[in-house]
Amino acid sequence: FNALHGDEGENGKLQAAFDLLNICYTGSGAQGCMLAMNKSLSKQLFRTHGIPTPEAVILSESDKCRAAELCEKLGLPCVVKPASLGSSVGVSIVRTNDEFFTALDSAFSLEHTVIVEKYIKGREFAVGIVGSRVLPAIEIIPKHGFYDYKNKYQPGCTVEICPADIDSDTAERMAKATRKVFRVLGLGAYARADFMVDENGIYCLEANTPVSYTHLRAHETKANLV
């Protein structure tokens, strides 16, 4: 049972090693894990297949000197994040030019490819899928700031509401998008898609596998935790 998180646990390397050694494991295969972990690739696939996702610019280190020019169309505020890290490590919401360049330096210190994404001001949701069954959406409400590393893992920093208080149309659109993400990325068994929702619609931020099953998600799947 693969419950590992972080680079080797999520980016497909461990799954590829298991495949070579003919070791059975749970969750998605090597290719699906790689695509889900690499947000620059997954965002390109989202666009190609009509999955709504925030507008973004992918930067390499050679682009740093003209990053402001390349990202001008996104405006401020915007989101700066490493392309292939999880748990919101290295993610910044920037509101000024000075913050933009500081956030770029921080993200590039962690990885060679960085995503600059249009900031969506709205509500945040996580939607799990097990097999063909989409689970009820969970609304993520940090008490302070955004859903960063601290708010994800420090008890009491975030409120999670399940099922989320949303209209049936929004719930169905997120469920439909989650199924499509699952199929397009070639994920298996279980996964999670993260969304922002504003007055203009839904936006898929990324897919996650293996997922972080909170007690709420476990309750919805009727899992027994020991």
Where do the PLM segments sit?
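Conserved N-proximal alpha/beta basic substrate-recognition cap immediately N-terminal to
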Residues: 2-57
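Phosphate-binding site of ATP-dependent enzymes
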Residues: 95-176, 197-203
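Conserved metal-phosphate-binding beta-hairpin within the catalytic cores
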Residues: 118, 127, 182-213
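Conserved small/polar residues in nucleotide/adenosyl-binding loops
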Residues: 214-223
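Active-site nucleotide/adenylate-binding loops and adjacent lid/helix of ATP-dependent enzymes
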Residues: 35-123, 175
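Short beta-strands and strand-loop turn motifs
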Residues: 2, 25-29, 82-86, 204-206
